[in-house]
Amino acid sequence: MENYELQIRKTRTVPGTRGNIFDRNGEVIAYNELAYSVTIEDIIPTDTKTEDKNKILNDTLDSVLSIVEENGDSVIDNFGIILDSSGSYQFAETNETSRLRFVADVHGKSFIDDLTEKEKNKTAEQIVHYLCKRYGLDYSEHDAAYILKMVNMRYAMGLNSYQQWLTTVLASDVSDATAAAIMENQDSLQGVDISEDSLRRYPDGQYFASIIG
């Protein structure tokens, strides 16, 4: 039987680094600063059972969350659900169309009109329950804040599920301590890595950021 070599081309976009900008007196008005991000690539074999994959991912993300927070940093917080002052789940969007667009995305629907009435009327808490079931997260064993952080990270990873080689940012602009701790524990953090980013800084504030570049 002939041997075949499987060749896979993986394409990633690498942002360019902009140079420093000086004013006419030689003072720096825009510069780059090295920053670290915690990223993850889904390297779990595609034939892994869903239950097993969920456990691997959840254990990994739980460890990442602990490391990040122990060093004073935070994981991503760009999900469509937030916690209100009483600790209850609420939709981040108050605009009804935007809220329904988010609900449609959660349910994998291309159009809002594809949602059933039951799906349209789901509360934020029901959406979280729905995703916990999908991700194999035990809703009853953890507080709302922990669950929301885990759902945040799992949902972000899910957005790249059809392009597994794309990395997902779990925490951005983290401290040197966080970056070092992640690297020290990398053997037990499947697919997790530290990426170097270039953040644009403006000594005189953001007032002219859109003009300076």
Regions found by a protein language model. Name each.
Residues 1-213:
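Membrane-proximal periplasmic segments of bacterial cell-envelope enzymes
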